[in-house]
Amino acid sequence: MENKEKIYEGKAKIIFATLNPLEVIQHFKDEITAFNNKKAAIIHEKGILNNYISSFLMKKLIDKGIKTHFISLLNQREQLVKKITIIPIEVVIRNLAAGNFSKRFQIADGTPFKSPIIEFYYKNDELSDPMVSEGHILSFQWLTNQELEKIKILSLKINNILSELFFNVGIKLVDFKLEFGKLHNDEQSDLFLADEISPDTCRLWDISTNKRLDKDRYRLNLGNVIEGYREVAHKLNAIPNL
């Protein structure tokens, strides 16, 4: 896989072309950012751990019937995935109050909800990813009504699967972000879960102590960022023997 053609580089990942036009390589970087890139650093090993954790979780979701872009783990930093045209909407599922949600509604971090809350954000760095309503999504034709309803159902199903999985290893899934898309050059494609599921995209707390095991360790200057990521990987037993 030498001299790979770079298709796209984001804050946390690089996408490379392959010989198959329907598949790409997703490479995980060590960069970490917060507050819409206003805060940034290099956390050595982060990309490796996120690659392992996301690969592990995607495979678990596939086993439960969720369609994802994941194909296979290639090496410590890379995975082979289906080439997806991403829908410009981030789906956030909240099980407990945390972060900006707590500030917006002036409630304590860790307050549980009677049922999960689903929020939608428009993926646009220049606009700081504004929160949008279902009306916005339909009016701007980012999704059809049928697709929107399917994403809500899929998101809640994914939440149930991941919440149970994390609970079984002593971790609370506080909230997390999902991205969906369609197969490249296929407008009639079904919806696929894409991007990653990792401590970069999830809030994960130790069940017993509420110790934060995710990107909040960086956002909130708690220190030992990589230790939180390592703890998640080890609790999940997500590091394979390559």
UniProtKB/Swiss-Prot annotation:
Record has Nucleotide-binding as a keyword: yes
The UniProt entry, under InterPro entries, shows: SAICAR_synt/ADE2_N, SAICAR_synt_PurC, SAICAR_synth, SAICAR_synthetase, SAICAR_synthetase_CS
- Reaction equation(s) it catalyzes: 5-amino-1-(5-phospho-D-ribosyl)imidazole-4-carboxylate + L-aspartate + ATP = (2S)-2-[5-amino-1-(5-phospho-beta-D-ribosyl)imidazole-4-carboxamido]succinate + ADP + phosphate + 2 H(+)
Q: Does the keyword Nucleotide-binding apply?
A: yes
GO terms for MF: ATP binding; phosphoribosylaminoimidazolesuccinocarboxamide synthase activity
Biological process (GO) annotations held by this record are: 'de novo' IMP biosynthetic process; cobalamin biosynthetic process
Query: What Enzyme Commission number(s) does the record list for this chain?
Result: 6.3.2.6
Keyword annotations of the record? ATP-binding, Ligase, Nucleotide-binding, Purine biosynthesis
Q: Which pathway, metabolic or otherwise, does it act in? A: Purine metabolism; IMP biosynthesis via de novo pathway; 5-amino-1-(5-phospho-D-ribosyl)imidazole-4-carboxamide from 5-amino-1-(5-phospho-D-ribosyl)imidazole-4-carboxylate: step 1/2
Give the CC-aspect GO terms. cytosol
Which is a Pfam family this sequence falls into?
SAICAR_synt
Checking PROSITE patterns in the record gives: SAICAR_SYNTHETASE_2
Give the matching PANTHER family.
MULTIFUNCTIONAL PROTEIN ADE2, SI:DKEY-6E2.2
Family according to the record:
Belongs to the SAICAR synthetase family.
Q: What is this protein called?
A: Phosphoribosylaminoimidazole-succinocarboxamide synthase
